[in-house]
Amino acid sequence: MPRVRVLLVSPDANARDLMRVSVGSIERRLGGPVSFLEAVDGEQGARIGLRERPDAVVADEIASRAGAFSLAKDLRGAADPYLGPIVILLERKHDAWLARWSGANAWFVRPVDPFELADRLVEMIESDRDQLRNQPKDQRETV
């Protein structure tokens, strides 16, 4: 199976490390290595996400200047939108409506259970790959 690339977005290096540990556990389940791209805010995350097209994006709600909600809106609203899974880690459960509004596929309230995060990411990445496999060859995006 091909390598999986995940973009981690947070101004906090410790938060990115925790995300990396949680997400890194999906390697065995997806049958291939996981590599990480990192951004410290939503603006940088949007640039990297649109340029690199990772398999998934995991963003901390407190992703400073342009936060996770803005990041998701920017990725979804771009001229060539990012269609992969976006997961937002929330500080408060009351912000779930913002995650939904922004176009996130999933959200978790801190503290995040790393197994739940990994399970959801695997589910979304496998679903995306199944859809791509079922798409006629002439309609597939070349990477």
Predicted regions and their residues:
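C-terminal output helix
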Residues: 18, 112-121
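Conserved acidic segment of CheY-like receiver
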Residues: 3-24, 57
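Conserved phosphotransfer microenvironments
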Residues: 55-75
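Acidic, metal-coordinating helix/loop segments flanking the phosphotransfer/catalytic sites
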Residues: 39-56
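Alpha4 helix (beta4-alpha4-beta5 surface) of REC/receiver domains from two-component response regulators
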Residues: 70, 88-107
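The C-terminal output helix
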Residues: 122-138
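His-Asp phosphorelay/catalytic-motif detector in bacterial-type signaling
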Residues: 80-85
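Short hydrophobic/Thr-rich beta-strand motif most characteristic of the beta2 strand and flanking loop
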Residues: 31-40
